[in-house]
């Protein structure tokens, strides 16, 4: 009934991936250290209105990397046995030019991310909650968790007068969605807010690397925020492996700011769809007003495992 017992009994717990059939319910496993909030929208809205909503929504690739780094034996296709950061590089944009720095940068990213997870509001995309529950237990957290898929609606409804900073690779799509009028994409009332945009580089495998490593790129992005956008009220991020270290640094540098990792939900928040990210699962969407993602697939991303982010 706690994190230790949960991990001790991990081998008895059925696990799924995106392609698994539904698993028949057999035995119930209870971990009372980590529980789902039963009042999610109200609690997250209250935090947001107090400018205290900080959450990173770690992705499945990042969760698998953390577990492997911590030597938690979870069967998954999201790392290679002798190359555990392969998917971090191919999917999430983690990079370094000098392989001699590999372990140094692993440790930097893990330390920043764990520091963040221990202090933040933990959210998960429930389709890979199985990774996150194990990761949270391995970090011995004692917290409530939330469904991150409700966060963008909370932001849309409660951002009156706020300055929102988008940090990600798809500035053209997000800006076009905003300029079209976000209210036109949704059939519920949307707040009036203004926008800043900070474009992050595409650094997945096959792309050119702009600096020596992701660490140096993060430092440059943080300096740009300090110089140009420090009066933001809410930051929303969709930038892969850059997310956790950026959020961890921003939460320490800026007090009373909302800093939220939305990933692909950034597109949906602004009424943008692609072939891999349809709008049809949103009952609140005014579908005829949504726009298709504008960005073409970048050079070097021909074999990217998640082409949903581009035309």
Regions found by a protein language model. Name each.
Residues 134-141, 196-223:
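Glycine-rich phosphate-binding "P-loop"
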Residues 39-40, 107-109, 216-228, 243-244:
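A short, acidic, amphipathic alpha-helical segment used as a generic capping/interface helix at domain edges
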Residues 1-194:
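Electropositive, gly/pro-rich neighborhoods at or near active sites that engage anionic ligands
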Residues 242-311:
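C-terminal functional extensions of proteins
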Residues 163, 233-234:
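Structural motif
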Residues 234-241:
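N-terminal glycine-rich "phosphate-gripper" loop used for MgATP/nucleotide binding
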Residues 83-88, 193-202, 260-266:
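A generic structural motif
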